Regions:
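C-terminal non-catalytic regions of proteins with extracellular/luminal or membrane-system context
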Residues: 1-405
Length: 405
């Protein structure tokens, strides 16, 4: 079924406005001519009226053709031409390119000898994100639902690993879905108290190796919350808040902290997989000697999780480098303290029409880059050189950092 967006309809009408005015003028002139000949004698009256009607019809047809050949040309062509399909060969090539990009882009942040898992085939995968991973961002970074996706768990299984089905069932049956980006910032995660003693004991018998998954969304259209208490989200438990006032989206929720505590108390060898589209405060890993490996798999697309499995198994040697700087405390950065939606004065004349479904009522805004040319890694390198910061206490993983096997 075709769905109409009123803003699109209004836009099309505005494009056709001069032509529609011409049609209206033609109709008015024709009607006036037909009325004016009312007092004429019958044969002459019929002739004038007939010619007036003929002229009206001809004029409307000409203008309608001008509309079709002019402002409506592209729209009519796209809506009437035969639908083109993507060939199986093109789809498979695209999937293979996605695997290659993920294989070359996944970053090995830490490795205390745990990776690759050459002799380990059984893995306990913890975290709700394991069954609801982040595949991509928003806008141009979003995915097409017409094509199948390789899930994180499928990628691990395709690499030859056997996964703990009890954990998978726990997360699948948790009964929550990932909220729409920008409207709800909930981070579903099973509370630690919902892991039964029997489930944990079975997991320990299954394997002494665990993967913990953490995921964060991001993309155009919505800034990530700098204070979770000021946005809409749902706590995972009635006994505590996932975030206190002032805590932000790019740090662990309380439920995630509890899960990591639970895993590290029960398993000797832990790998953290961060499936996120922005850098994250990962300083907590230094409190857990059990976390021996960290991988940053940033939105791997339709089939990229195949490569994650191959990296963990050792079939692929990770070679990705960080595209941004990982910091211990994001709140102490120039970016954090200076980004925003700052409005210029006297910009009402440039205000976007309220009918626009995406940015209706918006006016041009700006960001004040107070650090000048020292944006990103340049700031930390320069500030450390000048003695303004302690680099090692500020930067956890620098821009361009990444390990390999």
């Amino acid at each position: 079924m075709i769905k109409l967006n009123m803003s699109d309809v209004i836009s099309v009408l505005n494009m056709c406005k001069p032509y529609l005015i011409a049609i209206a003028v033609i109709l008015v002139v024709g009607i006036v001519a037909a009325v004016m000949c009312k007092k004429m004698e019958n044969p002459k009256r019929k002739l004038v009226r007939g010619n007036a009607i003929l002229a009206m019809v001809l004029g409307v047809v000409i203008v309608a053709n001008l509309i079709c050949a002019g402002p409506m040309s592209t729209l009519l062509t796209l809506s009437t031409q035969a639908a083109e399909t993507v060939s199986d060969e093109t789809t498979e090539q695209s999937n293979e390119d996605c695997r290659t990009i993920a294989a070359e882009g996944t970053v090995l942040l830490e490795n205390d000898g745990i990776l690759p898992l050459k002799d380990t085939k059984n893995i306990n995968v913890f975290g709700w994100a394991s069954v609801n991973p982040i595949y991509g961002g928003s806008g141009a970074g979003a995915l097409n639902d017409l094509y199948d996706r390789v899930t994180m768990l499928e990628g691990l299984e395709d690499a030859g690993f056997k996964l703990n089905g009890e954990l998978t069932d726990l997360y699948t049956n948790y009964g929550k879905e990932r909220a729409d980006y920008g409207s709800d910032w909930s981070l579903p995660e099973v509370p630690a108290e919902d892991y039964s003693d029997e489930l944990i004991e079975n997991a320990k018998e299954f394997s002494d190796t665990a993967i913990v998954t953490i995921a964060r969304w991001g993309g155009e259209g919505s800034d990530l919350p700098t204070d979770m208490s000021s946005v809409s989200y749902t706590n995972n438990s009635d006994s505590y808040n996932d975030f206190e006032t002032g805590q932000h989206y790019l740090e662990l929720s309380q439920t995630e902290k509890n899960m990591i505590n639970l895993v590290c108390e029960n398993f000797e060898h832990v790998i953290l997989v961060y499936d996120g589209l922005s850098t994250f405060e990962l300083g907590f890993v230094e409190d857990y000697p059990q976390i021996e490996g960290i991988l940053w798999c940033a939105g791997p697309g339709q089939t990229g999780f195949d490569s994650l499995g191959k990296i963990i198994s050792g079939e692929v040697n990770p070679s990705g480098k960080t595209s941004d700087t990982f910091l211990y405390d994001l709140t102490e950065t120039p970016t954090w303290n200076n980004f925003g939606d700052f409005k210029y004065d006297n910009m009402e004349e440039f205000k976007i029409d309220e009918s626009d479904p995406y940015v209706g009522g918006s006016v041009p805004t700006f960001v004040n880059y107070v650090e000048g040319i020292y944006v990103g890694y340049r700031f930390y390198e320069t500030a450390a050189q000048e003695g303004a910061i302690d680099y090692d206490k500020t930067v956890q993983y620098p821009f361009g950092y990444g390990l390999s096997y």
